[in-house]
């Protein structure tokens, strides 16, 4: 009897292993995976946020997902920090610390939730670590002996912590940065390797762009609490940014998959989540304007099968809705010119505009929508260009070369880069928009399309034309235009965002000797 029992037990065990292996093989061979990104309105109570996370993980809408990504800073705070396992130790908090004697209870609970749902779960939290655990970091430590990090944590389907990333570029946050920047990736059972970073990191070479250039990563998870700026840095936008605006532009320029989860509090300027498939654009995206929400957005994401070329030779040193709060770019530093729009008439502009030695050529055509009615006002447009450092107090800086068309609520540059009142309406329909720029070559840089409509979402790739060609060792020719026959009447921003990071090894920058050291044969003085 006992012999039959053990035989049956071993048979069931073997059958279970075979079914599991078969399922993994099927997931690996599929040409897509199913992802969910969460737009989440946080509260001040950890217990309420945790309950909201669990409700989403267990929801019907999340059933088909392989991976779920939650936003930045929507779970715990400095008053409820937790230790986080080192991924190298392959620790499962749900099994190793079920009573939460070392890790905080919410971390254990989410480990169990990932295990019970059999999904990869990406969260962002406020982490604590003992300073003594990093003896190589000789920087001063807090009096309590702890470092505090803004950290992504990834659980696999069993609840094991398989990856951890600590934010490099803090956005004015009273937290620590790591002694050396981290590059974090994790592999999945569906055959995709993800890289990850957090919010403000997207504007810098390390780690976001570096993972693409030096490791060939094609898929990214991206928790964020983005504070939008006009006109290019809404999540989707050009000179200031809205979350979705920058998300789509970054995914498009790098031709990678991006799973972006955003905090949802439009009153303070937080919103913007989406799933993006490189040059194909948005698979799902949302930009809340009136009120926050707690929702999951799901899409099937096509896999990139071809391996990317990697650069191994780089040596790195260390809405128009008044209820949406948005920051403003420093447009007074731009060279700009107002479009002369006559009511009821057709207009056009063909002009070069320069800021210092950086120039852009604009070709625009528009059709007036008629004379303004007595009880409404209309926004105007300017073309603008800027080359220089993007500076905000107490933040990491980067060097940008931007040019584009953007809206204003009046005739002065001081009236630009602000959310427009609901009563303002578009005065023109653009029938042609084209920008041509020659950008200098650099060791590290990223050029991407930056657009925004009055619903705070960007134009999709099917609505525009983009080309970037290397025309010499020193320069790239970029052309960005509306699709032929397409007309747009709700345009807030249309431009090219040139991010040159630290501007090192850029052609024409520095002495002749420095340019020769960067590999340029004919340096420009």
UniProtKB/Swiss-Prot annotation:
<protein>
    <recommendedName>
        <fullName>Vanin-like protein 2</fullName>
        <ecNumber>3.5.1.-</ecNumber>
    </recommendedName>
</protein>
<keyword id="KW-0964">Secreted</keyword>
<feature type="glycosylation site" description="N-linked (GlcNAc...) asparagine">
    <location>
        <position position="99"/>
    </location>
</feature>
<feature type="domain" description="CN hydrolase">
    <location>
        <begin position="33"/>
        <end position="303"/>
    </location>
</feature>
<feature type="glycosylation site" description="N-linked (GlcNAc...) asparagine">
    <location>
        <position position="116"/>
    </location>
</feature>
<keyword id="KW-0732">Signal</keyword>
<feature type="glycosylation site" description="N-linked (GlcNAc...) asparagine">
    <location>
        <position position="20"/>
    </location>
</feature>
<keyword id="KW-0325">Glycoprotein</keyword>
<dbReference type="GO" id="GO:0005576">
    <property type="term" value="C:extracellular region"/>
</dbReference>
<feature type="active site" description="Proton donor">
    <location>
        <position position="167"/>
    </location>
</feature>
<feature type="active site" description="Nucleophile">
    <location>
        <position position="199"/>
    </location>
</feature>
<dbReference type="Pfam" id="PF19018">
    <property type="entry name" value="Vanin_C"/>
</dbReference>
<dbReference type="InterPro" id="IPR040154">
    <property type="entry name" value="Biotinidase/VNN"/>
</dbReference>
<dbReference type="GO" id="GO:0017159">
    <property type="term" value="F:pantetheine hydrolase activity"/>
</dbReference>
<feature type="glycosylation site" description="N-linked (GlcNAc...) asparagine">
    <location>
        <position position="333"/>
    </location>
</feature>
<feature type="glycosylation site" description="N-linked (GlcNAc...) asparagine">
    <location>
        <position position="375"/>
    </location>
</feature>
<feature type="glycosylation site" description="N-linked (GlcNAc...) asparagine">
    <location>
        <position position="348"/>
    </location>
</feature>
<comment type="similarity">
    <text>Belongs to the carbon-nitrogen hydrolase superfamily. BTD/VNN family.</text>
</comment>
<dbReference type="InterPro" id="IPR043957">
    <property type="entry name" value="Vanin_C"/>
</dbReference>
<feature type="glycosylation site" description="N-linked (GlcNAc...) asparagine">
    <location>
        <position position="124"/>
    </location>
</feature>
<feature type="glycosylation site" description="N-linked (GlcNAc...) asparagine">
    <location>
        <position position="176"/>
    </location>
</feature>
<feature type="glycosylation site" description="N-linked (GlcNAc...) asparagine">
    <location>
        <position position="61"/>
    </location>
</feature>
<feature type="active site" description="Proton acceptor">
    <location>
        <position position="72"/>
    </location>
</feature>
<dbReference type="Pfam" id="PF00795">
    <property type="entry name" value="CN_hydrolase"/>
</dbReference>
<keyword id="KW-0378">Hydrolase</keyword>
<dbReference type="InterPro" id="IPR003010">
    <property type="entry name" value="C-N_Hydrolase"/>
</dbReference>
<dbReference type="InterPro" id="IPR036526">
    <property type="entry name" value="C-N_Hydrolase_sf"/>
</dbReference>
<feature type="signal peptide">
    <location>
        <begin position="1"/>
        <end position="27"/>
    </location>
</feature>
<dbReference type="InterPro" id="IPR012101">
    <property type="entry name" value="Biotinidase-like_euk"/>
</dbReference>
């Amino acid at each position: 009897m006992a012999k039959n029992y053990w035989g049956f037990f071993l048979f069931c065990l073997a059958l279970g292993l075979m079914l599991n292996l078969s399922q993994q093989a099927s997931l690996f061979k599929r040409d897509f995976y199913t992802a969910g990104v969460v737009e989440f309105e946080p509260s001040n109570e950890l217990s309420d946020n945790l309950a909201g996370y669990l409700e989403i993980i267990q929801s019907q809408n999340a059933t088909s997902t392989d991976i779920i990504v939650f936003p930045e800073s929507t779970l715990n705070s400095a008053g409820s920090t937790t230790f986080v396992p080192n991924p190298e130790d392959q620790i499962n908090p749900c099994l190793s610390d079920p009573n939460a004697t070392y890790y905080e209870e919410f971390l254990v609970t989410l480990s169990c939730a990932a295990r019970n749902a059999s999904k990869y779960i990406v969260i962002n939290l406020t982490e604590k670590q003992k300073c003594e655990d990093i003896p190589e970091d000789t920087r001063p430590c807090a009096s309590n002996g702890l470092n505090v990090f803004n950290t992504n944590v990834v659980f696999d389907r069993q609840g094991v912590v398989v990856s951890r990333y600590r934010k490099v570029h803090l956005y004015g946050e009273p937290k620590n940065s790591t002694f050396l920047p981290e590059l974090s990736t994790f592999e999945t059972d569906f055959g995709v390797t993800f890289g990850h970073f957090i919010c403000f990191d997207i504007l810098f070479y390390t780690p976001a762009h570096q993972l693409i250039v030096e490791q060939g990563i094609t898929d990214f998870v991206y928790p964020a609490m983005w504070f939008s700026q006009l006109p290019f840095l809404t999540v989707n936008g050009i000179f200031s940014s809205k979350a979705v605006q920058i998300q789509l532009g970054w995914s498009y320029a790098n031709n990678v998959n991006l799973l972006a989860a955003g905090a949802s509090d439009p009153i303070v300027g937080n919103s913007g989540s989406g799933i993006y498939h490189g040059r194909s654009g948005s698979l799902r995206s949302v930009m809340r304007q009136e009120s926050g929400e707690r929702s999951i957005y799901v899409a099937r994401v096509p896999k990139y099968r071809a391996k990317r070329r990697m650069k191994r030779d780089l040596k790195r040193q260390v809405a128009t809705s008044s209820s949406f709060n948005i920051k403003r770019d420093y447009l007074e530093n731009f060279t700009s010119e107002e479009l002369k729009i006559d009511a009821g008439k057709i207009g056009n502009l063909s002009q070069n505009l320069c800021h210092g030695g950086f120039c852009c050529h604009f070709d625009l055509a528009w059709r007036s929508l008629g004379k303004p009615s007595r009880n409404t006002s209309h926004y105007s447009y300017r073309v603008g260009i800027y080359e220089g450092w993007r500076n905000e107090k107490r933040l990491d800086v980067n060097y940008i070369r931007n040019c584009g068309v953007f809206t204003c609520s009046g005739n002065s540059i001081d009236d630009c880069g602000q959310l427009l009142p609901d009563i303002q309406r578009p005065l023109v329909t653009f029938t042609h928009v084209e920008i041509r720029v020659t950008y200098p070559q650099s060791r590290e840089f990223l050029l991407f399309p930056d657009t925004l409509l009055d619903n705070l979402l960007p134009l999709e790739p099917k609505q525009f034309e983009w080309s970037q060609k290397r025309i010499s060792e020193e320069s790239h020719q970029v052309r960005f235009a509306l699709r032929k026959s397409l007309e747009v009447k709700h345009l807030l921003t249309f431009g090219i965002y040139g991010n040159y990071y630290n501007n090192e090894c850029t052609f024409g920058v520095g002495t002749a000797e420095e340019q020769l050291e960067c590999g340029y044969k004919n340096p420009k003085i």
